[in-house]
Amino acid sequence: MKLIILGSGTSQGVPVIGCRCAVCTSKDPRDNRLRTSAMLEWDDIRLVIDAGPDFRYQMLRTGVRHIDAILLTHEHKDHIGGLDDVRAFNFVDYPTIHRIDVFGTRQTLKCVRKDRSEERRV
């Protein structure tokens, strides 16, 4: 089993827009961090933990072509804000459509469903 850290930044990522602290103004590339997320790999299975706004870039950067499931730790936007980008994985091998299971607490999944239904009404 392998754990890949996809992001370890704050809810806004690092650097934070407009911040002038030493970390946010640092030239050290280690101080540039995407929002928190990780991926577990074992055998041929990939489980992503949280899909925040940086999800698309995190997947492109790691060269991932498929995921099997997503675990959402809670309903804050920095953990669910990239779910729309998950759709691309459903159609990687079109016309075969891949199902991706999403796990979370009842409250988290309720919030995701509500968020998705509100987007469709706009």
Q: Where would I find each of the regions flagged by the language model?
A:
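Conserved beta-strand hairpin/beta-sheet module of binuclear metal-dependent hydrolase folds
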Residues: 1-62
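Cofactor-binding loop segments of dinucleotide-utilizing enzymes, especially the Rossmann-like FAD-
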Residues: 8, 105-107
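Short amphipathic alpha-helical surface micro-motifs
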Residues: 20-22, 54, 83-85, 115-117
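Detector for Asparagine
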Residues: 31-32, 90, 115
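Active-site metal-binding motif and surrounding structural segment of the metallo-beta-lactamase
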Residues: 46-47, 51-104
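A short, active-site helix/loop in glycosyltransferases that binds the activated sugar's phosphate group
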Residues: 107-116
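Conserved small/polar residues in nucleotide/adenosyl-binding loops
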Residues: 119-122
